[in-house]
Amino acid sequence: MPHSNTLIVPSTNPFDDPSSIKNGLNNLTSSELVNQMKKESLAASVKTPSTPPKECSHLKKGVKLSHLKGNARALRDPSKHLCFICTTEKIKREDYELTLCANCGYLFCCNHESDHSRKHFEKNKKHCVFVNIITLKCHCYSCDADIVIFDKKNLVVRDVQQFICSNLVSSLTKAPNVLKSNSSHFKKEKKSKHSSGKSSKKYKVISPGLKNLGATCFFNSTLQVLCACEALHDVISPFQYSHSSVIVRKLTKSPESSLLSAFIKFLETFYKSDGTISVYRPTTFFGEFRRLHPQFSESVQQDAHELLRLLLDDLISEEFRVLRFNLNSVSRSLQLSPCLTDDEQLSKSLTSFKQVNVTDASLSPNSHNTSDNEQNNEDYVSVSSLVGSETEDITYSKELSQSSDSSQHQHDSFLPANSSPLAASSTKSLPSSELLDSSSDKGQQVFKGQHEVAGTNSFEDPNSHFNVSNSSNHEEASPKKEVLKSPQFQRRSLDILRLGELSSDDMMLDKATMDEFSSSLVIKSIFTGRLTSVVMCQSCNEITNTPEPIQDLSIPIHYPSSRVSRRHRFHRALRSRFSRSPKKSSVKIVVDNANDDTDQAPTTNSSSLNENLLGGHASENDKSLKQSPFQKLTRRLSDLSVNSSGQISKQDFDNSNSIFSESSLSSPIIEEPKTLIDCLKNFTHVEELSGENMFACENCCNQPNEVGSPAKGGLTSDNDKYSFNNSVYRNAYKRMLLDDPLPPVFIIHLKRFFQEISHDGYANPKKISDFIEFEQELDLNEFVMPHLRASSSFRYRLFGVIVHSGTLNYGHYVAYVLSHKFLDLSAPSTNSKDFRSEAGIPERRWLYISDNIVRESSWDEVSKVEAYMLFYERV
């Protein structure tokens, strides 16, 4: 760096000269070199000068620590140690020093004729302070002098130097195939409780990083956590980590699924990594996923949680198609009847299917060098089904399928449209809209033809039409035909295919057979759990359970205070009063006279009760003269609910008492949760459904004197627009609890992105950067259904964390994983692969992964990060 005035004595530190640094690499290890660089450079910066130093007046405007933290990624990645101007102008230079602008955080070269650091200063006069990232010398171009720290002056320079030391990953000091952060050498890390072994052991990281394909850090971090999942490893790799886990079946590549095959091939390559290749390019897998979801384009920041949800849904859907295809192949190999209504034959084919090994010989084991088009250039695919003593090779040619009946639905790389030739020849393809219309004669003829033909009882592709046939005779199956014609059944069947679910009522098969079929979905059994919504009506005390499958639990970490909510409601009501939009139609509601104790029919006061139950408007005179009629109505409905409450059985009382206990009803919500347990308590907190969120109770409707009754307890009238004959609006309590089965892998998503409603009604998207404390072990016994708490333990162990740093519009994803991908350098080299044929160690240690940067971490570092998604595995 050129200097006109030097305020300190020239240092004799050999690290001031970059050439001396390179010459000394042979005599020092990387850790010793980094430590010595830090100590001597910091010592040189505070060395007593020969003349009294001057305090630089430009530090206040020239140093912006907040801007430096935003560009810390350039220091952590050695591949980004390039001059900003040289990169922009595509100039290639070697052996030049880099300086960090203390204002914007960009790197600029300084030891050649161009001197881009000075050019940057001449263009932006406030950007005058630069720090050499190797020697840590600070220079001010406005003063044209070096800046030194002396007698509590210029202390902000020390902050910049410490920032560089804690984030710099120099290409001169990194070990082969392993990228380590200098900060791991400056601090003595606490050992994780999952890392067993003596402290004298030395480990080498062999876990590969992933190449950033253009703002794909969200994709790389999610993949790294999935690669660290032991349950997923045990169903793909022939070598198990957890011998106590029950494996449904091995997950293998199949020519009928492009995304699933690319996913399995990537994991197989990752598991076989031994450190020879430090960075992989997930081009094939990302290309297959982007083909299904074009919105995930390169160079555009995306959400890692959205990616995970779509990825798991696609993998489960493709696995379901492969399962159906292989089941039909086994059925044909056993020469079974195309009609699979016999439960014993179907159960036999399911048992035989588990013995089938489906392989794809065209898939190369080297996935990191495979192009995107390799999987789409196959002329035919072959499925070998080995069942008992019979061996049959069934070959399906794509050319034959294209030359077959033109009405048959075509597939590129998934299942054939009709699993039975008989069904294919007797069924014409119709659009889903025509097929789901129960009033369409064409749709009824299709189902009638399928029913009369002894064909398949099969599910079609969700993108195609849905065919269900029955093998029983016409007289016996007439009630079932009505079910098949039902649009509710047809829509439910299509939803089942999209979600990968199976129902014994929809399939009309034995429940045990369908449970066995559904349990064969490997990815679904690993990641899918169940969340139950429990609602108790305050009038009849009836409990309604509504379960739903979940693959992750999204819990909020921000709860606005009641004061802010009242303010927002006031402004919303004020805007609606002066709104020019047409008012909603009012609803006439019949209630009892509050001052009349007799059983006479209630009167309707349209002037005071002309209020929309779903948020309509009352007259302006009522608003100005007295309290809102809607508030009176809500309080009146609550009184009616209490007065009309009936008796409850002992069993229902025990269930309601355990779920809606007195402590859960009285415990307030935690407005500022600090820990993960606080967030889970808020999520499972008892919520009161009242006002606009009243519960439509069907049990109250079935009791006497309810709907349209002139007696007490009548809530709505049969003539009302929003009245339904099968339900009555009641106040109720609601609680969300986890239900059986709990998944082996439990994913928690912290909602850090939300929209804040301002006082003027506009939604401002924001990110919550609050720290949420989480533990390595999580006990979910408090958050499951009461009947499960005494049966088994629900303890989980943390194995992966995804962190998002930055703002809502710009940021970066990194991952912390608990990995086996280490080599014990203190052990003999022959023992590195004795644990399994995959390189690694039996115990697991924490890793920090940022795209292609992989370094060892510790629980002390992981526990302090700003977690976005937490991955737990059941113990």
Swiss-Prot record:
Residues 575-586 have a biased composition (Basic residues). Zn(2+) 3 binds at residues 101, 104, 120, 127. The active site is at residues 217, 812. The modification Phosphoserine is found at residues 333, 337, 486, 493, 645. Belongs to the peptidase C19 family. Residues 208-875 form the USP domain. The gene is ubp7. It catalyses: Thiol-dependent hydrolysis of ester, thioester, amide, peptide and isopeptide bonds formed by the C-terminal Gly of ubiquitin (a 76-residue protein attached to proteins as an intracellular targeting signal). This is Probable ubiquitin carboxyl-terminal hydrolase 7. It comes from Schizosaccharomyces pombe (strain 972 / ATCC 24843).
